[in-house]
């Protein structure tokens, strides 16, 4: 049973718009959330995904504000996180409201080249933006919590987002170190979580106004840092999964009071059909849970109309960046390996070398070298030794993508497996082959047109090359429904 703190109810009663009912709000908070997912278009189109899942008993209701988002129904005993299609990265389990901020940031401009996600983990919005960018440009994804950085990296890897650079900093430093560096910034701020009560019945059990006010001070510092990191003419989206004015409108008003006409709020009333139901007088979206039968959420968008003074002197460039640009000979060798042995044409990005490692960075990353320490950049392509190149799992997941079928026609060594074989592979087991043949060496294991990873073809079996940390204890095969 949902427990709503009386102090919270009293506060919300003063803020709830006149056309909305408090009884409807409480009733909505007491209902379970509708299940929702976002199709990962880096790997599969929404239409192809629906055709894949409809025979398995899924039904799809479009989410109005996300072209690739759907409310779904299916056998609720199934643990979707274990589903083969989820492990493959074909979809992300994402609450519908949380799809709003990336949509707001990329509408109407979908051509941002340098984007910052200031508070990224676990990665739903990061990977949504990576798909909207179609793995072009540079997406810097920051997370302050060390344990959550690992989760973020795992999701970026699973979804095949190749143009991300991960950082692990307090978000308040970005205005100083990466001053006016980004075309667009998303800050989905840490918050009181009042909108999440439908999935966490105890979220508001110990709600207090003092804690709200304390959090709002952190949010003000974060939005100011994000604004300073934004280029003039760029767009910033600020969002929370909370409902009170202190953490929402109050934070946006603080920024405008601080920077005056450099802050221009953009109305979101036309973002999607029905957006006006949640639009505030300022043009923000204040999504109460009863409006769209979703989590509570807040989204604001602004344009930075002019440059503003930096608050700190420009930091010195950091030395000893461990990567160097590949020589023409090195670049040609790694390109030939991917093309000839794997049937994959490498994108026209920066090929970088560190010791015997070959990496692929976005071109846009050049401007960021030495300005900040990055946990992870781009994609590790391969290791090189006297025996030649050995491709890395993440490169196959990120770069093979939807091109595998075409790649096979171009000479790629691809082995298509059944669903049962795919399950065995993801659980770390070797796959016996029905007929023995000539050993083919390294091959790409593929299921349903999307890569699972690498294996060594020994003639009578596929020797599993899946990294040990990605081996699953359980893989769910969703059965066809009559």
From Swiss-Prot:
Keywords: Cytoplasm, Methyltransferase, RNA-binding, rRNA processing, S-adenosyl-L-methionine, Transferase
Pfam families: Methyltr_RsmB-F, Methyltr_RsmF_N, Methyltranf_PUA, YebU_pre-PUA_dom
Subcellular location: Cytoplasm
Name of the top EC class for this enzyme: transferase
Family annotation (PROSITE patterns): SAM_MT_RSMB_NOP
Residues binding S-adenosyl-L-methionine: 119-125, 143, 170, 188
Entry's transmembrane regions: none
Chief location of this protein within or outside the cell: cytoplasm
Catalytic activity field: cytidine(1407) in 16S rRNA + S-adenosyl-L-methionine = 5-methylcytidine(1407) in 16S rRNA + S-adenosyl-L-homocysteine + H(+)
GO MF annotation, one: rRNA (cytosine-C5-)-methyltransferase activity
Catalytic site: 241
Function: Specifically methylates the cytosine at position 1407 (m5C1407) of 16S rRNA.
Entry similarity comment: Belongs to the class I-like SAM-binding methyltransferase superfamily. RsmB/NOP family.
Name of the protein in its database record: Ribosomal RNA small subunit methyltransferase F
Organism of derivation: Shewanella sp. (strain MR-7)
Gene that this polypeptide is encoded by: rsmF
